[in-house]
């Protein structure tokens, strides 16, 4: 019964201790209580954790290295056994070959065993001390929580309004006991952790010095065995010197090793860094070619567009000759065929484009060509006005009524200048044709006729570019 009571009391005490520790940690995380900290110990604990991680990694790699040595030992032993099996007893060096194979096996056994003892076992002993230190650090953390809990409990009793001396005395006793345990453990760890952290250097030096010495001895002894094996093979070669070792079926030059020369680009293509200059020079004057009157424009020009005639770069193009009245009439008729009577024309000074199927030529959009066109049309209009003035002065008298009166004149008798530019009828009729003023604004449309007089053909400015605004086109 006494043992049962003592066991129950110990269990209750442990439960109470765990509960008080959990409560203290929660209060510390919430900021209700102050946690005791030791910066020197925290730095030593961090170094210990780093040292432990490095040691575990090195031990893992050393274990893999020793395992590879075991695999190499087994492979070397199998190769030696196979060589002894295929080596005929009649061949020279049969006895020496068996001795070399036995020495090779013993050398591998010694190297493997010493690596395990002087490197792997030493690293295991080095890591074994980490377990005890790790547990003591965890114990120190628990004692720190007990110390903080006892201190906070004592402060709460001392700051209470109604003080109980018995409880205060008991709390002071618990606080002193927790303080002694914590400070003693904390002092020991603060002394041992820096020493343990510095011992890693001596451990690394010892391990790798042992590995270097073992490898040096192993390679020296293995070099002697390799020399002996080479001499045995030399004796066998002299014994059977008539036998020649030839590898057949291997070409001297493989296609996979030949690098073909880079393919040069064809000469017909221009250089990718230079763009061809398709535009004519700015100084050359070009005159657009008008479509043939009375012929189908679609036969010569695809998609209803007339291309300008070819011109040599840099060669000036002559302007158009002075136009006669008959030529002006034929030109106006062809222009009426191109433009149409009821269609609105969108004439942009930057884009001289026509609608599909109109058959009007599309002129090059260059400043030099536009300037030449304006000068040419101005000269044509001036010569036409002079010709009409001379014809009016010499061909018709002011009082002659036979040629102008009576309303017998037909549409075909109207002169090109009068029909196109809205001049007054020669018979003094009150019917007048509303003329179209050619203004420098290219986008304006010509107004239709108001009375029964024949409608003058519309000027397609896309075929004939706008004239110079300085020209006056009033009829004489």
From Swiss-Prot:
Output compositional bias ranges, type Low complexity.
325-339
Domain of life of the native organism: Eukaryota
Stretches with biased composition (Pro residues): 310-324
Q: Which part of the chain is the BAR domain? A: 26-242
What processes does the entry annotate via GO biological process terms?
A: phagocytosis, engulfment; plasma membrane tubulation; podosome assembly
Where is the region Disordered? 269-369, 395-476
Give a GO cellular-component term.
cytoplasm
What molecular functions are annotated in GO for this chain? phospholipid binding
The subcellular localization recorded is: Cytoplasm
Q: Which UniProt keywords apply?
A: Coiled coil, Cytoplasm
Q: SUPFAM superfamilies attached here?
A: BAR/IMD domain-like (SSF103657)
Keyword Zinc in record: no
Q: Which InterPro entries match?
A: AH/BAR_dom_sf, Amphiphysin, BAR_Bin2, BAR_dom
Give start-end positions of Basic and acidic residues composition bias: 340-353
Q: What segments bear the compositional bias annotation Polar residues?
A: 279-292, 461-476
> PANTHER family, alphabetically?
AMPHIPHYSIN (PTHR46514), BRIDGING INTEGRATOR 2 (PTHR46514:SF1)
Stated name of the protein: Bridging integrator 2
